[in-house]
Amino acid sequence: MSKGLLLLWLVTELWWLYLTPAASEDTIIGFLGQPVTLPCHYLSWSQSRNSMCWGKGSCPNSKCNAELLRTDGTRIISRKSTKYTLLGKVQFGEVSLTISNTNRGDSGVYCCRIEVPGWFNDVKKNVRLELRRATTTKKPTTTTRPTTTPYVTTTTPELLPTTVMTTSVLPTTTPPQTLATTAFSTAVTTCPSTTPGSFSQETTKGSAFTTESETLPASNHSQRSMMTISTDIAVLRPTGSNPGILPSTSQLTTQKTTLTTSESLQKTTKSHQINSRQTILIIACCVGFVLMVLLFLAFLLRGKVTGANCLQRHKRPDNTEDSDSVLNDMSHGRDDEDGIFTL
């Protein structure tokens, strides 16, 4: 009787374990319209023995409810839609499910079931997915107001180079001087007109000035004057409240003379600087050469003096021996004389 009760109790316990799925549950929060990955890993994965499936809803007693995806241990063999995929390496047990382009219907509970051979050995994992709206942050807008600058129109910009060309030819020859002065006087009388209707008259007069200037003979002096005039155009432009009034010939000549004098002063200063540098270099070279010669002579004199001293030192002991021999001879001679006197 006791054995029957024991067997009945074991059967009921096994049936209860079979009916109650032992599955863990995680919660994943995602955002609508963005991909979401539901984690699932199995460390003891075997390519030949294990397989797995993903389903919608909690894990049942066997297989997966509303199966979304299934693998055979190495690769995906079936899937419900292309939005469900496994980005990990299936052969190493990385079977996390990735859902792309999520919507509200994708929220809920998902089951990851890893099938292991044997009774009650399947690994079950429930993952709850909660989808929310992505928070949108407004970018700060910066408004920049355009700055308006007043534009002042001048009515006589084209007469300036023509009048300057007539004055530049003055120092070349004597006959064209009369033409240039007359043309300049007429230009001065017509410059103050600032109405738009006077453009035609001014342009015709400007063309007349250019034709008169073309009749003048071209030479090297005229070309040089043209080069200087291009730098003086900025000086001749009208400034102040009366933009139409041109400067007089005396002002032009004074400006040209000041420019030429300033250029000549700059050239002279540059030439003086160059000459001073050259003279300094020449003097330094000469001084260095003289010092080298003096050092060479001193070295030679020192060698001669040392040689003479050495010779004198070598000759001194010979002189002493000679002097000793002479003194001995003199002493012997005196002894002989004393002996003769004694005899």
UniProtKB/Swiss-Prot annotation:
Major location (coarse): membrane
Localisation: Membrane
Tissue and organ distribution: Predominantly expressed in lymphoid tissues, such as spleen, lymph nodes, and Peyer patches. Also expressed in fetal liver, salivary gland, and spleen stromal cells, predominantly in the marginal zone and to a lesser extent throughout the white pulp. Not expressed in bone marrow-derived cells. Expressed mainly by antigen presenting cells (APCs) in T- and B-cell areas, but not by T- or B-lymphocytes.
Protein name: T-cell immunoglobulin and mucin domain-containing protein 4
Sequence ranges on the Cytoplasmic membrane side: 301-343
Signal peptide: 1-22
Disulphides: 40-112, 53-64, 59-111
Gene this protein is translated from: Timd4
Record membrane topology: Single-pass type I membrane protein
Highest taxon, organism lineage: Eukaryota
Organism the protein comes from: Mus musculus (Mouse)
Miscellaneous remark of the record: Belongs to the T-cell and airway phenotype regulator (Tapr) locus, a single chromosomal region that confers reduced T-helper type 2 responsiveness and protects against airway hyperactivity (AHR), the hallmark of human asthma. Low expression of Timd4 is associated with lymphotoxin deficiency.
BP term (GO), one: apoptotic cell clearance
